[in-house]
Amino acid sequence: MKKKKILAVIAAATMALSMVGCGSSGGGSSSGVANKDKPLVWYNRQPSNSSTGELDKTALNFNKDTYYVGFDANQGAELQGEMVLDYIKKNAATIDRNGDGVIGYVLAIGDIGHNDSIARTRGVRSALGTAVDANGAVDSSPAGTNVDGSAKVVQDATLEVDGKKYTIRELASQEMKNSAGATWDAATAGNAIGTWTASFGDQIDVVVSNNDGMGMSMFNAWAKDNKVPTFGYDANSDAVAAIAEGYGGTISQHADVQAYLTLRVLRNALDGVDVDTGIGTADEAGNKLDEGVDYRYSEEERSYYALNIAVTADNYQDFTDSTKVYDKVSKQLDASKSPEKKVWLDIYNASDNFLSSTYQPLLQNYDDLLNLKVDYIGGDGQTESNITNRLGNPGEYDAFAINMVKTDNAASYTSILNK
């Protein structure tokens, strides 16, 4: 595998300023293509209004070779909710730890303004019956502490199993944001479970999280020792392995498919071939995904969505290596027909467990297969400028893959490419 050029998060400010000062003032790369016309893929964080969820169509249509790659958030959210509900039904006789007739759960919310986080919160509440309508949609707001069931953003639900009725209650939920402003924060989730268990630990029967990073933090801090099932999302390697130790389950968002699509749409644009090549239509090497099984495509949204799979005690051994390339799209491209090209790609938070431990290793496996030389830029998870300051000379690159800190901030990147 060729040596990867990975740029550190703590790059010196003087270097960043130097890059800006020496950067192209709007010209293209040596290929003669203007920066604004180069292939661009948004991934993992879809350009959208963080308050309303409305897609940023301007960003998604930045040029003719712009796409988004992610996963089907609603389908995955529904799967997670169903997974939790199925577990409760199968274990109703033993899951009520204190025998009070109330099956209480706590929920770690990643980012109240992130579409995926919103969908997952809604999916769990809808499946468990604790959802409350707010302006025509399920309220995804944090409930705070709700031990007495008086919160307005959720409601108590009733579940009958084998003739016995149980109350299902969201005991507490909060956004896991740290003091520096970083969301989806695992350490904050670990602290939260400590606070919750100190106050009402005997009432917590299930732990649910918007992702595995936060879920594993709560599992390791408390749930594992107390044999409380914990459910996450992402199918990170440590979470999948933890299923053997009592972790309830997780959702694979088919990161192997997402990583492939992230680079494949760029490769196709750079080669001047149909965007579906090697995706829904086999390429010369035989790479091909199955639409409706592995992914779906929305032409209106210019978006590719990988489809999700529930990972539980029944099938977790099939998901133990989260960085393995997908067999269907594992064949090397011919370098004479797909010559090496240079790609600028950022990861919004270098400390994010899923992105750094699963997604980036997959990208690094696929960039070799697709003959792409990728510069990986690690962000701090807090500010766009920490990333954009290192896009000082876009003229050096043939294509771009962007993972924003906030979904609202696409213009922070396109304004640079438009110069």
Language model features: what each stretch is:
Residues S18-G21:
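C-terminal motif of bacterial Sec signal peptides marking the signal peptidase cleavage site
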Residues M1-I10:
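Bacterial Sec-dependent N-terminal signal peptides
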